[in-house]
Regions:
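C-terminus-biased signal that marks the final domain/tail of proteins
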Residues: 21-157, 163-167, 181, 195-198, ...
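Active-site rim segments in enzyme catalytic domains, especially the processed small/beta chain
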Residues: 166-259, 266, 322
Length: 469
């Protein structure tokens, strides 16, 4: 704990002078911790919207420059198969005026990120790039086709409370499933402290330049904690007409200004563009209540519990959402053990409702997220495309790896938290596959020459221990 005189929430008044850019930005309202913690980069920003954004941009300027010059253009070319310039223009045309009008605070923060990164690097990093990067998940379904599916099937997660857990408190757990290139940017733990009167502070896993989490793992000062799993196979494209707004602005609004689970629902439903359909798993640590909130385009599902479990595996729990808003293949595969979401559904149901019900704690939450049991073969594996800790890069079955055999996609992190940890403003995180598996880009590319065009961006991953963050 700090011993020197502090301002709000324990941040030293002279903290700004301890950033890595003190010579150019002596009054920056932010701090980057000097060393990574088991692979995680930790930063804190505070002040008004532009000040927070500016500090964010300065502190993560090196990472943002790499995303602008290499990573985002690669992702757009690989997954959307359009020129990057077209993608950035599409984002501007669809979202720029809407965000500026509907969310002026967040527009200021985005502008600050661009200004801070430009100042720190000496290169132009535009707000259009920052917007296009934030909008990656929102725009994914715009370009979905049989040749390049959207970035769904992204996570495994659960939340439990009451008689389902060892102590009765809330336990929440989540791992991200993603392509290894974009996933490698999500090692940021960002704390945001707004000025008094501008909402509550937030702590979240995120990527450089993002104003919301993106991986969607967050703690809120008001006692709300949350995560989500994407609803895969949606049968519609987002609608940003008529003032409909992107999900990353709505969820940030909910995190910063929502006071209750009801507020989260209201804020997320208002202006919903259907751009990133999710099964949200939310908990109120003050009331010991959890909620499943599934939001598609026109259909939603809300369930609450003070005893029990909710989990997500990239299919809607709601039969109505599956029937109305997902493609037949996705809707019909809810319990299909040969398909990734169906297989994880079967395994999560067994682990959460049979093996660990009444005993769920932080330790076995980590075990569940690391699980490599393949229900289609009834055997333990080293991990594959069907397991909770997913490894599509080790998979040659097309039903288990729909993007193709040995695709560099899978589990890239793990996070767990309890109510008591959240109240102490911390969680446990593992950077890299939840199981601890080490991924060597060099070894992978030597074995799988079809991915040689990934060589300039594919990272090494894994091998880090869990960290308290």
């Amino acid at each position: 704990m700090p011993t020197k005189k502090t301002s709000r929430k324990g941040i030293p008044k002279n903290q700004a002078r301890k950033t890595r850019n003190t010579r150019t930005d002596p009054l920056i309202k932010g701090k980057r911790f000097p060393k990574k913690k088991n692979g995680w980069i930790r930063i804190c920003v505070w002040g008004n919207a532009f000040e927070r954004g500016y500090a964010h941009g300065v502190l993560l300027s090196k990472e943002l420059l790499e995303i602008r010059e290499k990573i985002l253009p690669f992702l757009v070319k690989t997954f959307y198969q359009i020129p990057y310039e077209q993608y950035e223009k599409d984002c501007h045309d669809q979202l720029y005026d809407t965000i500026r009008t509907e969310y002026p605070e967040f527009f200021e923060e985005l502008s600050g990120i661009a200004a801070g990164a430009s100042s720190s690097t000496g290169k132009t990093i535009s707000i259009d790039f920052i917007l296009a990067w934030n909008a990656d998940l929102s725009m994914s379904n715009m370009y979905k086709s049989k040749k390049h599916p959207s970035k769904d099937e992204r996570c495994s997660a659960f939340i439990a409370v009451g008689d389902a857990t060892e102590t009765g408190e809330i336990i929440m757990a989540h791992n991200t499933h993603s392509d290894f290139v974009s996933a490698n940017t999500f090692n940021i733990v960002l704390e945001i402290i707004p000025n008094k009167g501008d909402g509550k502070k937030i702590k979240m896993q995120t990527a450089p330049g993002f104003i919301a989490s993106g991986s969607d793992w967050f703690l809120c000062e008001n006692g709300i904690i949350g995560c989500e799993t994407t609803i895969g196979g949606t049968n519609y494209k987002p609608d940003f007409s008529g003032g409909q707004t992107p999900y990353f602005c709505r969820i940030r609004q909910a995190m910063q200004y929502g006071e209750s689970l009801d507020d989260f629902v209201r804020i997320m439903q208002k202006g919903n563009a259907g751009d990133y359909a999710c099964s949200w798993l939310l908990g109120d640590t003050r009331k010991k209540e959890i909620m499943l909130f599934e939001l598609g385009l026109k259909t939603s599902n809300i369930e609450r519990k003070t005893n029990g479990v909710f989990y997500g595996m990239n299919k809607a729990i709601s039969p109505e959402i599956r029937e109305k808003e997902t493609e037949p293949k996705s809707a019909n595969g809810f319990w299909d053990m040969n398909e990734t979401s169906g297989a994880r559904n079967i395994r999560l149901h067994f682990l959460l409702y049979e093996k660990y019900y009444g005993k769920i704690n932080l330790s076995n939450a980590q075990t569940i997220l690391s699980d490599h049991y393949d229900v289609s073969t009834n055997e333990e594996t080293r991990g594959n495309g069907l397991t909770i800790c997913r490894h599509a890069n080790l998979e040659d079955r097309i039903t288990a790896s729909p993007r193709g055999a040995f695709y560099p996609w899978g589990c890239t992190d793990g996070k767990v938290v309890s109510s008591s940890m959240a109240k102490r403003w911390s969680f446990l995180g593992r950077w890299g596959p939840t199981c601890g598996h080490v991924f060597s880009a060099k070894d992978f590319l030597e074995k799988h020459l079809q991915f040689k065009n990934w060589s300039s961006v594919l990272p090494n991953m894994g091998g880090n221990p869990w960290a308290r963050l």
